[in-house]
């Protein structure tokens, strides 16, 4: 099972086991603080109208990341154990956004992008199982903002459709193996640029990682920013 088909247990709210379709674990980045912005003032992407990430022609701004991050916190149940360190949470969330753009591009190529109706049907099933408020809490415990649920479902469904297109009737392992090279290919074709304050893009492993020169904002800095 590839990283775009995440299932499992999440802590909090009674550690309910969730099998939410094939939810992509998506953790949105915490907005960089003024001190970090000053530190990285000369970096190229940060000059592109406040972009946190640019993937092809798509972009997400730092303010959009901040809004999604805050909405995740607001949706967490009272007994939640939290989402981990800001650095870990933010990086994984940003990576999920990158995946959503890449998977959508592959879906367009193969003519199998999940439709609004398919996304709505998948969400309706989840809301029937967990209730509307319950789904928001389950998603938040996976660091998925309420506004990002449909995006996450579309990515998950499109990934599934592409997998079936590439290896009809194949096992999950066979389909994941077929999609892996496509993810790398399309990531390179689109181009992924991460604002250095958040890290850098590893094109071979298709992950967001620390900058080799240490320019990405440290966990301590993010914690200090939260006050």
Regions found by a protein language model. Name each.
Residues 1-86, 184-227:
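Short, low-structural-confidence N-terminal segments
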Residues 32, 61, 122, 158, ...:
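Alpha-helical structural motif
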Residues 45-144:
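N-terminal targeting/tethering segments
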Residues 86-109, 128-199:
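Solvent-exposed, amphipathic alpha-helical "stalk/arm" or coiled-coil-like segments used as scaffolds
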Residues 116-127, 149-162, 207-225:
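Hydrophobic transmembrane alpha-helix bundles
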